[in-house]
Amino acid sequence: MKRVILLSILLFTAGVIRSELASATEVGTSRQFGLGVQLFEPTAFIGKLFLDRNDAIDFGVGFWGYGRCYNNNGPYACSNGNQYFSLHFDYLYEEPIVDTVVRLDWHVGAGGRMAFNSYYNGDGRHDAALFARVPIGLDLTFRRPHWLEAYLEIAPGLWILPPLAFDIDVGLGVRAYF
C-alpha cells in the first residue's frame, strides 16, 4: 500500500512538472531556454529560462577588464586592465508590445549582481561587491529564424556592498533558444 501511495505521489509530481514545462511552450512559441552573449556592463554569457508565458529567470556570468572597479569606497571608473568576474540573476516579467512580423516584448524585473576583483588592491584582500538591480528592457524575437532573440536592457540599482552607491547596468545582447 505504501508503494502505491509513493508511486501515485511521484506520478502526480511528474505530471505537474511536465505540464508546467509544457505551458511555457504551448503559448504560441517553441522557445523555453536560451543562451547567448551580452555586451557592455556587464559583458557576459547569459541564459534565460521561461517559467510560463510572462515569467522568466535571467542569469549571466561575465568577465571584463575595463569599466568599473570596486573597492571599499564603492565603484569607480578604471581602465587599468584589471580583470573582474561577475554573476547576475534576475526574475523578469514580460508583456508583448507588437506581435506581427517580429515579436517585441518589454520586460521589468528584480535581481542582483555580484562582482569580484581579481587583483590585490592594497587593503589585504580581494574585493567583492553586491548590486541590487531593476532590469527594464525590450526583447525582439524574429519569426525567421524563430529561435533568435535580440534585446536591450537598462538596469538601475544600488551597490549595497561596499558602501551604498547608485549605478546603472546597460546590456545589448542576443540569445538562441532551444
Pin down the residues of each PLM region.
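Outer-membrane beta-barrel "beta-signal"
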Residues: 166-178
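Extracytoplasmic loops and strand-loop junctions of Gram-negative outer membrane beta-barrel proteins
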Residues: 28-30, 73-75, 155-156
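Outer-membrane beta-barrel pore domains and translocons
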Residues: 38-40, 62-64, 111-115, 153-159, ...
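Transmembrane beta-strand segments of Gram-negative outer membrane beta-barrel proteins
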Residues: 29-39, 106-112
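Cleavable N-terminal export/targeting peptides
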Residues: 1-28
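Flexible, solvent-exposed coil segments and beta strand-coil junctions
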Residues: 25-28, 115, 150-153
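Gram-negative (and chloroplast) outer-membrane scaffold detector with strong preference
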Residues: 49-150
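Solvent-exposed loop/turn segments connecting transmembrane beta-strands
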Residues: 33-49, 63-69, 81-83, 158-167
